[in-house]
Amino acid sequence: MKVNCKGYPTKFCFGKPLPHCASDGKTYPNRCRFCNAFVKSHGLITLRYYGKCK
């Protein structure tokens, strides 16, 4: 799955909680946190699905 991470990273993350389960096995609480991690990983992590990782 793809997430639009244009404009990231950002210093502050606000917004509605919408958990993102990433390929690194971590649950990110919202798109902002996921996109910050995505950019930091140089695009190596991907979105597995929306929701908490199981």
From Swiss-Prot:
A Pfam family annotated for this UniProt entry: Kazal_1
Start and end residues of each Kazal-like domain: 1-54
GO cellular component: extracellular region
Keywords assigned: Disulfide bond, Secreted
Gene3D superfamilies, alphabetized: 3.30.60.30
Localization of this protein: Secreted
Principal place of residence: secreted
Keyword rRNA processing: no
PROSITE patterns: KAZAL_1 (PS00282), KAZAL_2 (PS51465)
Site (Reactive bond): 15-16
Domain of life, source organism: Eukaryota
Coiled coil location: none
Positions of disulphide bridges: 5-35, 13-32, 21-53
Tissue specificity remark: Expressed by the venom gland.
InterPro entries (alphabetical): Kazal-type_SerProtInhib (IPR050159), Kazal_dom (IPR002350), Kazal_dom_sf (IPR036058)
Record text on subunit structure and interactions: May form disulfide-linked dimers or trimers (in vitro).
Function per UniProt: Partially inhibits trypsin in vitro at slightly acidic pH and concentrations in excess of 0.3 mM. Has no protease inhibitory activity at neutral or basic pH. Has no antibacterial activity. Shows no toxicity in vertebrates apart from transient paw edema in mouse.
Name recorded for this polypeptide: Kazal-type inhibitor-like protein
Organism of provenance: Bothriechis schlegelii
